[in-house]
């Protein structure tokens, strides 16, 4: 690494070549890893790379808990949960938080029906027992509204789902499910916003011309994989990848205004790469959702240490560095920029 000059009032100065590297490694290794909690429906399926439950899909810790009795059929239908169903759902949420979940996502897009319920359970329990917050995003559909800001005027976001008919039904039933929860809860934990106007912070309006709901019902091998499950679920995922990419390309040719794809179905997330390559468009999916939430808990300490001045008050002069990222240009003699006191303590082994 090249050398650069620190501002004279930044003391003490640190020379990386005199630092005990292993002490630093041990300090950073002691930082707790980000943990994602996955709320599962009562449904067994074969996980694959790109699925929300496959540990290879992420570079952080994953734990899961099942909402017993909440089957795929019930989730898809948005059926009202009885007292026992709600108790089992809340139990699963508490289990995730007790096991260290920093945030919670769902393993089925139709869990969006219980976004408000799970969010309220999580925030209430995490705050009362541990004095912390626990963000909840049950479905990648929560990304629909902010993604509208990324597309050009007249453009569309293609929303990929396993069943177009079932997803269209969400728009009608979601406010009802949320209103039932708010009434029974007495408004104690739910935000005081009419569900029909602001359902859990998720603005779902598929009649909006900026959305194009695309069902994967016609992709035979994918449908078979969903219906069969078990050993016969997937003959060759490469065939499914090609079929989905070709189908999306076909839809895109008929709807050239589609500027991006949002995958709602968690089991289709593993084919995001094929859609990106096949259509040439950006793709967001359930994996994107998990990674997005994880960033709120990721301390990018090495970068912070190199780009901030003592106590984080004085950033390096961007004009004296490459790309304004605090990297030394190699032209300045002297010493590396002084680290903040907290990072100095880490290096000296006093923290």
From Swiss-Prot:
Conditions for induction: Highly expressed.
Additional record remark: At least 10 million metric tons of volatile dimethyl sulfide (DMS) are released into the atmosphere annually by the dimethylsulfoniopropionate lyase in oceans. It is a component of the tangy aroma of the seaside and functions as a chemical attractant that guides various marine animals, such as sea birds, invertebrates, and some mammals, toward potential food supplies. DMS oxidation products act as condensation nuclei, causing water molecules to coalesce, with possible effects on local climate through enhanced cloud formation.
Record-given protein name: Dimethylsulfoniopropionate lyase 1
Role played: Mediates cleavage of dimethylsulfoniopropionate (DMSP) into dimethyl sulfide (DMS) and acrylate. DMS is the principal form by which sulfur is transported from oceans to the atmosphere and is a key component of the ocean sulfur cycle. Constitutes by far the most highly expressed Alma gene in CCMP373 strain.
Keyword set includes Lyase: yes
Reaction equations catalysed: S,S-dimethyl-beta-propiothetin = acrylate + dimethyl sulfide + H(+)
Subunit: Homotetramer.
Keyword flag Lyase: yes
Domain of life: Eukaryota
Family as reported in the entry's similarity comment: Belongs to the aspartate/glutamate racemases family. ALMA1 subfamily.
Gene Ontology molecular function, alphabetical: dimethylpropiothetin dethiomethylase activity
Keywords, in A-Z order: Lyase
Active site location: 108 (proton donor/acceptor), 265 (proton donor/acceptor)
Effect recorded for residue 108 to A: Decreases dimethylsulfoniopropionate lyase activity by a factor of 75
Enzyme nomenclature, EC number: 4.4.1.3
GO terms (BP aspect): protein homotetramerization
Gene that produces this protein: ALMA1
